[in-house]
Amino acid sequence: MSSSIKEVQGAPVKWVTNWTPEAIRGLVDQEKGLLDPRIYADQSLYELELERVFGRSWLLLGHESHVPETGDFLATYMGEDPVVMVRQKDKSIKVFLNQCRHRGMRICRSDAGNAKAFTCSYHGWAYDIAGKLVNVPFEKEAFCDKKEGDCGFDKAEWGPLQARVATYKGLVFANWDVQAPDLETYLGDARPYMDVMLDRTPAGTVAIGGMQKWVIPCNWKFAAEQFCSDMYHAGTMSHLSGILAGMPPEMDLSHAQVPTKGNQFRAGWGGHGSGWFVDEPGMLMAVMGPKVTQYWTEGPAADLAEQRLGHTMPVRRMFGQHMSVFPTCSFLPAINTIRTWHPRGPNEIEVWAFTLVDADAPAEIKEEYRRHNIRTFSAGGVFEQDDGENWVEIQKGLRGYKAKSQPLNAQMGLGRSQTGHPDFPGNVGYVYAEEAARGMYHHWMRMMSEPSWATLKP
């Protein structure tokens, strides 16, 4: 990839169907802050992503409260692979491929529920809640040698593929790769920023309001990057009308200033990132209203959160936080929407979103969270529409030839972030920056070009 935008204007696109490590490394230049647009639209790159990114990363599936009782299940995805997340008799959680080992039909066709077993609707192979094959119709007649009495068919060998499962403070993640680092190592120095939403109270968190799902015709990286690194859009054009519309009538519009104080965090490894405003709660008030804002900043719940987390960072001074855990887990603490961007080819995603609240929050506060998330960050939410419109139009442009012929600029805050911030841990810079985005794309490039954990691991 050229080191200068001017040098490549009008240059021909280099079409690649067999992506070598060298070619992939040329797609992202974090030192110069340049991105090759083909990372968002190339089919062959996407197919490699399914193997090297989604086949090796820890992926968010849901929350422990989605499957509270034995046999409770949630059918979801890891990349494009359908999986089932099931609560076991010993209260652990298993995740296995939603695929019958006979001809590949799904063994679970419900979104969620409770089951004692999963039976394939094609030929009737049945699996227990641990994913063990327990019944095959006409097993003796069809698979056994009647003369010798030796069946030669071992059901224990024909269960669905099992994923690794780990939880972090209520969130359930899974990973196909046995060589990948454990979840806490994978999350690394991003964990304190996750705790701002997940660990405010000893009671933990609970999911409310069900799982909302919708489709956006855009590449998954646009969504993941925005939640990882992009406060810029919220403070400039995209959400200003929605913020003004959501302000309480008693709030003076002259106080609706665009915040200027804040920071951005880039994970030391892993492509995770976060950003937030400092000491400026006006945007939270406009998005979530006075009751949630007061709950988050004042009173017993805020005091308890400060006691639990204040030794790490001044959580009471943080507002409007956004965050992504690479590759596709994103959330907004205080607003408390959390979602997974399930990829559906290079040009489409399914958004699966739910609302998370403190388990011991008053019923009134839980209802406020549910109501405001429907209004703001849901399939019909005002801010969700703003974001989706931008991503869709970008993706439309990338259908063209010239649109993929020159690099995109990711140079905001280049070289300015550093460790040693007095208030916030890790690599921290100014809120209006793209350091976390550069970290995300650099890690994407490494996962795509380094097939071995021997070089990729933290």
Swiss-Prot record:
UniProt gene name: bphA
Reactions mediated catalytically: biphenyl + NADH + O2 + H(+) = (2R,3S)-3-phenylcyclohexa-3,5-diene-1,2-diol + NAD(+)
Top-level lineage group: Bacteria
UniProt keyword annotation of NAD present: yes
GO biological process: catabolic process
Enzyme Commission code: 1.14.12.18
Annotated binding of [2Fe-2S] cluster, by residue: C100, H102, C120, H123
Cofactor binding comment, as recorded: Binds 1 [2Fe-2S] cluster per subunit.
Subunit structure: Heterohexamer consisting of three BphA subunits and three BphE subunits. A ferredoxin (BphF) and a ferredoxin reductase (BphG) must be present to obtain activity.
Stored InterPro entries: RHO_NdoB-like_C, Rieske_2Fe-2S, Rieske_2Fe-2S_sf, Ring-hydroxy_dOase_2Fe2S_BS, Ring_hydroxy_dOase_asu_C_dom, Rng_hydr_dOase-A
Domain Rieske: 58-156
Pathway: Xenobiotic degradation; biphenyl degradation; 2-hydroxy-2,4-pentadienoate and benzoate from biphenyl: step 1/4
Name the record gives this protein: Biphenyl dioxygenase subunit alpha
Residues annotated as binding Fe cation: H233, H239
Keywords from the UniProt entry: 2Fe-2S, Aromatic hydrocarbons catabolism, Dioxygenase, Iron, Iron-sulfur, Metal-binding, NAD, Oxidoreductase
Source organism of this protein record: Metapseudomonas furukawaii (Pseudomonas furukawaii)
Cofactor(s) named in the record: [2Fe-2S] cluster; Fe cation
